[in-house]
Amino acid sequence: MVNVEDRLYEGIAQQAGIAGCTLVDARMVRTGRAVALQVFIEKDETTAVTIEDCAAVSRQLSLWLDVENPIHGAYRLEVSSPGLDRPLKNLHDFERFKGSQAEIHLHGLTQGRRRLQGELLGVEDQKIVLKNAEGRWTFALDDIHKARLVPQW
């Protein structure tokens, strides 16, 4: 997986906003020789993303990408909702999904652990708080490599 550069990410976020949605995440994914720009959007915290929302963002992004040409080479544009296992990207996400199960991958080891799963307790003093059977854990956002919700069935 290749990170989307900050400037490109900001442009994608702006175009999603013009189409009435909020950018959750964007990434370039390579599978063999094919490259896809995957864009994950949400409408707002209470409204589900529809196929029409995805189409509107796709149209808006396609126009912008054609004009700005920020990606060199061929790629496929994919726009969708983030799904039940949505990524958690900022402090607002960690607070918003307080009470949910989450999986957190850290950049380095914390008490011998690089990956933790448990219940999100929210954000306290700009630190993310997670609770599991082993105890209570706190992390700075910068300590987290990636985080996602874990769907409960």
UniProtKB/Swiss-Prot annotation:
What are the BP-aspect GO terms? Answer: ribosomal small subunit assembly; translation
Q: Where in the cell is it found?
A: Cytoplasm
Q: Which domain of life is it from?
A: Bacteria
| InterPro entries cross-referenced by the UniProt entry | Ribosome_maturation_RimP, RimP_C, RimP_C_sf, RimP_N, RimP_N_sf
* Keyword terms of this UniProt record: Cytoplasm, Ribosome biogenesis
GO CC annotations, alphabetized: cytosol
Family the UniProt entry places it in? Belongs to the RimP family.
Q: What does this protein do?
A: Required for maturation of 30S ribosomal subunits.
What this protein is called in its record is Ribosome maturation factor RimP
Q: State the organism named in the record.
A: Acidithiobacillus ferrooxidans (strain ATCC 53993 / BNL-5-31)
Query: Per UniProt, what is the name of the gene that codes for the protein in this document?
Result: rimP
